[in-house]
Amino acid sequence: MPFLGQDWRSPGWSWIKTEDGWKRCESCSQKLERENNRCNISHSIILNSEDGEIFNNEEHEYASKKRKKDHFRNDTNTQSFYREKWIYVHKESTKERHGYCTLGEAFNRLDFSSAIQDIRRFNYVVKLLQLIAKSQLTSLSGVAQKNYFNILDKIVQKVLDDHHNPRLIKDLLQDLSSTLCILIRGVGKSVLVGNINIWICRLETILAWQQQLQDLQMTKQVNNGLTLSDLPLHMLNNILYRFSDGWDIITLGQVTPTLYMLSEDRQLWKKLCQYHFAEKQFCRHLILSEKGHIEWKLMYFALQKHYPAKEQYGDTLHFCRHCSILFWKDYHLALLFKDSGHPCTAADPDSCFTPVSPQHFIDLFKF
């Protein structure tokens, strides 16, 4: 018969019925504490001064380790990642499994922290964070929000260190700051998990990141080896044709006059439009020059405002339709050990795998 004390978090007292009536039974922790006290008394009697000094040093070392451990647990920058390569996605309760998997739980358990270090997965994770910032930020739990901003911090530091794709991160931070401004202004109307002061501090951090990226300067590398300008024209042209983003083509065209000439090629922009958009969409947004030629470059940016461009990623999460498991697929392990990336029971696992786009990842957890 538990007795609930004044502190609602207390487990209360435990009582047991005996022949003489109800008696309070002591918990195991109290018994252990009493035994420890007895041991400490006996130790103080037995130990001499030299042994006592050693014993005190051990106690001091233990207390120091405990403080560090508590600090690690309470540190707001500490990440709560499981570092798992796969998770089971269940959308309803069953006899075997209670509850369901939420977006925040999936975000916590999948190893996004290591994924941003892989250049093939970097853009994928950034796009996923951007979609969460636009529409799913309020659906994340407190732990998931902390992990979200810790991953974002790692991404910003990575961009500041290696200058990899800063424009993509600027777009992400712009969307995130806009969402936070709206949520903070409408506090009380929107479901914003956590203290409002924490969110204001996070917004200030985002503004500081934006300023750091704005001040980012590309240092000129002093290298006597082969540079991009030394390559033949047909190789430079081949590089430009590999790009799937129009802004990347424009940015590269600003490096040298030769690259600018190649970046203005009408055929290049035509191929880019055909890759991202359908022919029916061309007809609705035709832009002609004074001579009657189609302005493919202007059409690309016009179509981009009306239709979503085709997304292309080096590596993505995969979903197994047979096992209902979401996982990262390690291609090196798959080639060497025929590892599917998760414990799959299908006869032909590869036929059950589906690449998961960032939007599909969000949709998986809409119940």
Curated annotation (Swiss-Prot):
Stretches the record annotates as Interaction with beta-actin: 1-83
Residues in F-box domain copies: 226-274
Keyword match DNA repair: no
GO cellular component: cytoplasm; nucleus; SCF ubiquitin ligase complex; ubiquitin ligase complex
Xref: CDD domains: F-box_FBXO25 (cd22099)
A biological process from GO: protein ubiquitination
Tissue distribution: Expressed in all brain tissue observed.
Pathway listed: Protein modification; protein ubiquitination
Keyword vocabulary terms for this entry: Actin-binding, Chromosomal rearrangement, Nucleus, Ubl conjugation pathway
Function: Substrate-recognition component of the SCF (SKP1-CUL1-F-box protein)-type E3 ubiquitin ligase complex. May play a role in accumulation of expanded polyglutamine (polyQ) protein huntingtin (HTT).
Quaternary structure note: Part of a SCF (SKP1-cullin-F-box) protein ligase complex consisting of FBXO25, SKP1, CUL1 and RBX1. Interacts directly with SKP1 and CUL1. Interacts (via C-terminus) with beta-actin (via N-terminus).
Disease entry from the Swiss-Prot or TrEMBL record: A chromosomal aberration involving FBXO25 is a cause of X-linked intellectual disability (XLID). Translocation t(X;8)(p11.22;p23.3) with SHROOM4.
Annotated protein name in UniProt: F-box only protein 25
